[in-house]
Amino acid sequence: MSVAWPKIVLFGDSQVQFSFDPTSSPWAALLATRFQRVADVITRGFSGYTSRSARIILPRIFYPENILDVEAFVIFFGTNDLSGKDDAPQYHVPVEDYSENLEEMIKYLESIGLKKDKIILMTPGPYHGEKFLKFCEERGRTLPSRDEKIVPEYVEACLNVAKKHNLESINVYEEMKKDEDWPRFLIDGLHFTSDGATLIYELLKPILEKKIDASEMLMPDWRDINSVKPEDASKSVPV
């Protein structure tokens, strides 16, 4: 008999795309280690994407057939949405539209069979403009700047959507800002360092552990397998 393997889905922008990178921000890798032989951690990260583009591609990536066995679905957008509307109009998404896009994604996931209590929203993290510009200049890059003052507006919008739909949420901005030396969490003023990745992992882990029983690994422990009759191991596989 086949074994259903629970899934943890991380859907977001570059913060998710880079989340398995061991050289920068491996928070998905940390989750995968914590939930090994318990659940698959699946990343669907799209660098440079906004909530607007995420809303468009969501039905092309997730549908009734592959949403089965998903026990947790994390939505993590907003980093690009708050780009300056004059500096980067192709990225900028007004905060009202950001809220609407999150709501539409939630509604779509519900429509294909995902229970709302499995959805987790994560707010944008803090932005350090000086560090970001220095990083870009050192590499000869021209990247869209953000206005540090409007970040809290998008954070609040995300939290309000979560509250409206009774979803669990993580205030990444607030949790990082609690540290007096919060810029250490950001490698370039925007994306996470290894310290930032560890914090994200520590914030997500207890929420995921409430949704997925991580007390026992799937399939029998090797010590419980009869080396003479290994087929007997199937008897201890949960049905």
Language model segments and positions:
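Short N-terminal amphipathic alpha-helix/helix-capping patch enriched in small hydrophobics
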Residues: 23-28, 50, 54, 58
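Alpha-helical cap/lid subdomain in secreted, periplasmic
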Residues: 2-5, 30-40, 55-239
